[in-house]
Amino acid sequence: MTTKTDFHAIQELREKYAPKVRGIVSGEEAKTIYEVLEIDKRNNIELQNIRDMVVMIYGQWFDKSRDQYLEDKKKGVQAVDKSAEYLDAMSAITCVIDHEKFKRGMGV
């Protein structure tokens, strides 16, 4: 049984985790993801639910960040597009979850 809602776990993870290298999840990063999302405490359905929520919420954060960047650029404001960081994080998080699903014999 988990100690927090999926949404709160994802918010906490957003504060504690950002990929250090694109396309690579270090052991330390995987441990952070595993612990914050309480992956070991989830049954198979809860594991799929948190994965779906990660994709949905990080996708929304990506869209919002990208829209803000484009709006700032249109206004002539010097801005850096950080939206891809959300996609990198989402990919890393789903990789860790999918690895757990695979270990449990679930479809990935």
Residue ranges and their predicted role:
Residues K20, I24, E35, M53, ...:
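Detector for intrinsically disordered, low-structure N-terminal pre-sequences
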Residues T3-D6, I33, C95:
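N-terminal compositionally biased, intrinsically disordered segments and leader/signal-like regions
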Residues M1-G27, K103-M106:
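Extreme N-terminal leader/activation tails
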Residues T2-K4, G23, G59, V80, ...:
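Intrinsic disorder/low-complexity segments
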Residues H8-K20, D40-D81:
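Amphipathic alpha-helical oligomerization segments
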Residues E28, T32, I39-K41, E46, ...:
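Alpha-helical oligomerization interfaces
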Residues Y58, T94-I97, K101:
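A structural signal for well-ordered alpha-helices, especially hydrophobic packing surfaces
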